[in-house]
């Protein structure tokens, strides 16, 4: 079993809450908004749909949480050399922001 699969299997609510606590002062608590749509009401009757408005996050996406969590796990001595992200999109923006922090 690869290390990645092994790590994924370890993810649980306690870990998520622990990491949320670690980064809470650096991340924006973004709002949640109910979606009002007659089309969706017809498509999904008796449902409520909500959006988490991550566009208000520092990087404009939810990726900031993961990038910051991982960046903070890197030893300070190694982190001073920078962070590399294999991305040209939202994750790259978040990784750059996390490295800057």
Give each language-model segment a name:
Residues 1-101:
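PLP-dependent amino-acid enzyme catalytic core
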């Amino acid at each position: 079993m690869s290390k990645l699969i092994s790590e994924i299997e370890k993810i649980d609510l306690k870990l998520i809450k622990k990491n949320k606590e670690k980064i809470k002062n650096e991340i924006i608590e973004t709002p949640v908004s109910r979606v009002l749509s007659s089309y969706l009401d017809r498509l999904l009757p008796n449902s409520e749909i909500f959006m988490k408005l991550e566009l208000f996050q520092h990087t404009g996406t939810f990726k900031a949480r993961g990038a910051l969590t991982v960046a903070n796990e890197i030893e300070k001595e190694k982190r001073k050399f920078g962070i590399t992200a294999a991305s040209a999109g939202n994750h790259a923006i978040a990784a750059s922001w996390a490295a800057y922090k």
